[in-house]
Amino acid sequence: MNISAKDLTVIPECLIVLIDKPNRGKTASMRNFACKLLARRGVSFVHPRSYPANLKKTGKDFTLVVEISGVRVGIVSAGDGDDCILHAVKVFAKYECRIGVMVVSEPARSGGSKLALDAYLKMKNGCKARVIEISKASIKKDTHEESNAEVTSILLNTLDFELKHTK
């Protein structure tokens, strides 16, 4: 899988990236974030097939594109595979997202994709976007649910800050 210079020409102004090892609840956290975001006033769908069908199913990857105060926000959880980064980049380009929120899996001995992480690092170094990385592993809570709630809160606060500065 290669991310070309052409793919990087339409990268959002800001990328918010949730990083952790495979099977650690990144998609569940992203799903919670998306559901909380959709519950807000002033959020309209750009990519309508994403919800509610995909968000109701747990453990499933999804793509969601919304518009908030005139700013398009793409949210992509495309798994741990080699093509997950390219899929996110293409979604952000297709829907002209100014802010992109995505999941990146760190490689692990038991799985994960070094190719995907390498592609992400290449994309990060090759684009002019602000890249905000949130490490799910650094959030220590007693339960999985508490950890997901904390990640959701961080994602929402980060997005709110970026929306104020992306016009």
Language-model features, listed with the residues they occupy:
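Pre-Walker A adenine-sensing motif
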Residues: 1-12
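Glycine-rich phosphate-binding P-loop
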Residues: 14-41
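Conserved nucleotide-sensing/catalytic segment adjacent to the nucleotide-binding pocket
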Residues: 42-107
